[in-house]
């Protein structure tokens, strides 16, 4: 049932978060067109987007990440040596769609008529979500990013030297646990109500 799922989320928050803080920037440049940087030693650039895996039954969102070489947060040794369209996928993604190494997986843009083909080079078992990982350089090539463009930072400590105005969202482990707690709370009372209804 639902509360079990929430317990699962709570115990797997680190499986949904690669670092204690995830900062997504509004843009990689500030208002003066200067590249946004941080002095924080924990901070690591990353890219992310969401693509859709289409099937007859439903279109499912897949998180796509560009990960820094020798990342401290997503430890996939071979990532930087992969070819442009080669990727690692989360084991949950592989299991759900029966994908194995060497398979080609096709994903689409949600709102544009654009499709990408990726070749599965390996699996990453530390992520609970349906996700796909590539090196940050390959991500830039695949999605045709501008030279210094990136999505944000992963960090295990709070980043204090980036102007709030430049940050689109900050996600912390605390947020995810809190979200699960709130859901648990609202679902909990809803479930009791539902059980009473069933008895009537």
Residue ranges and their predicted role:
Residues 194-200:
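Selective detector of the "anchor" transmembrane alpha-helix that sits immediately C-terminal
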Residues 4-194:
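Basic-flanked hydrophobic alpha-helices used for secretion and membrane insertion
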């Amino acid at each position: 049932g639902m509360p079990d799922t929430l317990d699962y989320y709570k115990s797997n928050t680190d499986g949904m978060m690669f670092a204690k803080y995830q900062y997504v920037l509004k843009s990689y440049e500030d208002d003066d067109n200067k590249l946004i940087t941080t002095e924080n030693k924990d901070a690591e650039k990353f890219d992310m987007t969401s693509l859709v895996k289409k099937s007859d039954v439903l279109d499912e969102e897949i998180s796509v990440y560009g990960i820094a070489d020798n990342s401290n947060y997503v430890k996939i040794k071979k990532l930087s040596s992969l070819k442009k369209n080669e990727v690692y996928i989360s084991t949950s993604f592989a299991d759900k769609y029966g994908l194995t190494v060497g398979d080609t997986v096709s994903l689409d843009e949600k709102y544009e008529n654009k499709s990408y083909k990726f070749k599965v080079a390996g699996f990453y078992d530390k992520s609970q979500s349906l996700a796909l990982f590539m090196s940050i350089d390959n991500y830039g090539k695949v999605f045709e990013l501008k030279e210094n463009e990136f999505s944000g930072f992963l960090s295990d400590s709070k980043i204090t030297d980036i102007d709030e105005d430049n940050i689109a969202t900050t996600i912390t482990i605390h947020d995810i646990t809190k979200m699960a707690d709130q859901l648990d709370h609202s679902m909990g009372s809803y479930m009791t109500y539902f059980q009473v209804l069933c008895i009537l």
